[in-house]
């Protein structure tokens, strides 16, 4: 208890002492005296436009004021009415230096008055130097040098340098700088304005720069940036992010050790509307035979440069009506030359027409420490952090990078076939070319965009090795995988991510699709040669996709609906063709008990159909409980058809299939064998009885005379009349009904209506067609159909070839109509002879 009281007393005493110190600091008197003809003016003003609740005043001669100005030759004493004046007031010390009427005070610039003579406020020292247009002024900065910052950025220690120049009467901002950078000198012409901002807690008492006299530089300014080792610098054009002055020239000089290499990359730029001349950047590169080298701002900038070089930005004469703005922000990266920079790689895209290859940095976050950049160089000179190689050319590239794992390659290729008559049954292989695998940079994505004629053909993907669908229950752990997406206009349907080592034999997609090979580990280069997708064009089908699955006897096969976590698109249908070996039994299990789907219009169904017996079960996904685990002895279909769901009610289904060996009951086998033996014994008895009865009933043969039989020898007949006088050249038509009419009569004597088949497009052998869902707006309950009672939607088909017979007609057969109407359900039309 005593210890706690003691601690509280110490804390209270510290707070009182701190408050007393702040109170004394605010109430103690300050005195500022400025020498005559010093050119220095001191002003104390309120810093924030919105005054706080408790107003703080400057107290001078018992007067409370909010602004105080001290001019050369004046001495003033004052105090503050509050204990924290640094939160209310700012101090500005401005010195005007006239180099036009007299000599300039060149050399080190001092802080006048010194910081020890000033009250503890946020301070800004301003030096405004005016000179003739023909005189150049140079600001030299001591170590540590300056680092330019962009708009919205701040310095860690709060100390900033703002530098401006003059073009006639117009002030031009050169930039804002912090400490610890590479900028060592800034050369100006026609005067310079330098502002040093010091926070109230900073005890700095030197300016940190000096002014020197130079000859005319014939441009707006020259900024010198010195690199003593590896590092980077970000620099901006004058007035950035505003517009660069019209038709002006600005130069940056870079000092780089000879053993290091420098690369330039433009981070942000805009060009204006030029009437005359052209906006450009010019490089003076040591050893170049074409100095200066001229580039447009849109061009790839030089890289891998050894030693010092200059970069200049040249403006143009802008359009008076619509000038636009010219601005530039760029980065210079200096680093050690890498071994890869001496190697050249050939990328031959001369035979390609629809392929592009991009080398770019991986999205990795770096800390504050310097990280050497990674550049891709074309022809060893034009370097950039990312390069896109287009089709139709041979490209020579090299790398300026200390760690090539920080880069990766993305490739896109379009494969299209627009003539469905030519495309049908055509196939090709999706495989990564060898020249891409030989690059020292790892492949990230290789995307094939597959285009087919609309509503004419569909696509089928057949892998070299069966695929596994990536799920949370069984994730893919391979070095690469495939992402399959249907790219139908207006609807992108993501089928999922697949890897080798599964049970999916083929994937059929209705329309245009995108297949992306994504590499996850460098070892994929050794494994990808074993894999490959064969793409072929197949007859068009209406479902979004069809998966052909042959389950593994050792593992579960997990399958989930497309667009997982986003829901199957409205009014779309997907099927799975699941094969079951003859000696196995498949168990189908759905993960959820209910789908949680709510339809706005239409109905959603899940159909399970046996392919051999055509028996099927139909489940309403909106109203009913999803099917419980079911066993299937033969191959079967699983179909999911979606409705138009309500917002937030999406359709996602996950199910799996397992195989177990088929077992046979011994009692059933014995019973079947016994039944077969009894049946065979009964057949033998029946045959013996029939033969014995025939022998008893058999009598002697009896001859029968038939007087209607012609017993004369056949002779050649002659026509009693001429051809013109008889109808021997007219033939009667014998209908099938007159020959086979007795076969068309039922037990009642009436003729049976002929069976007329309808044309159906060929869809392969039995089992290749997924089940057809009920109409979208029907209210069909769950129905089960057996082999003896087929579903109405599946009419029986005869295995033999169907014949169609016309009905018999009581009228006479016309002699002029000899065609038999094979597909007509009515009798032949009567005609007059």
Swiss-Prot record:
SUPFAM superfamilies: Spermadhesin, CUB domain (SSF49854). Residues 417-540 form the CUB domain. Residues 809-819 have a biased composition (Basic and acidic residues). The chain crosses the membrane at residues 667-687. Residues 783-833 are annotated as: Disordered. It is a single-pass membrane protein. Glycans are attached at residues 122, 180, 205, 270, 310, 342, 386. Residues 30-666 are extracellular. Keywords: Cell membrane, Disulfide bond, Glycoprotein, Membrane, Phosphoprotein, Signal, Transmembrane, Transmembrane helix. Residues 688-833 are cytoplasmic. The record marks 368-369 as: Cleavage. GO terms for cellular component: plasma membrane. Phosphorylated on tyrosine by kinases of the SRC family such as SRC and YES as well as by the protein kinase C gamma/PRKCG. Dephosphorylated by phosphotyrosine phosphatases. Also phosphorylated by suramin, a heparin analog. Tyrosine phosphorylated in response to dissociation of integrin alpha-6 beta-4 from laminin-5. PANTHER family: CUB DOMAIN-CONTAINING PROTEIN 1. May be involved in cell adhesion and cell matrix association. May play a role in the regulation of anchorage versus migration or proliferation versus differentiation via its phosphorylation. May be a novel marker for leukemia diagnosis and for immature hematopoietic stem cell subsets. Belongs to the tetraspanin web involved in tumor progression and metastasis. Interacts with CDH2/N-cadherin, CDH3/P-cadherin, SDC1/syndecan-1, SDC4/syndecan-4 and the serine protease ST14/MT-SP1. Also interacts SRC and PRKCG/protein kinase C gamma. This is CUB domain-containing protein 1.
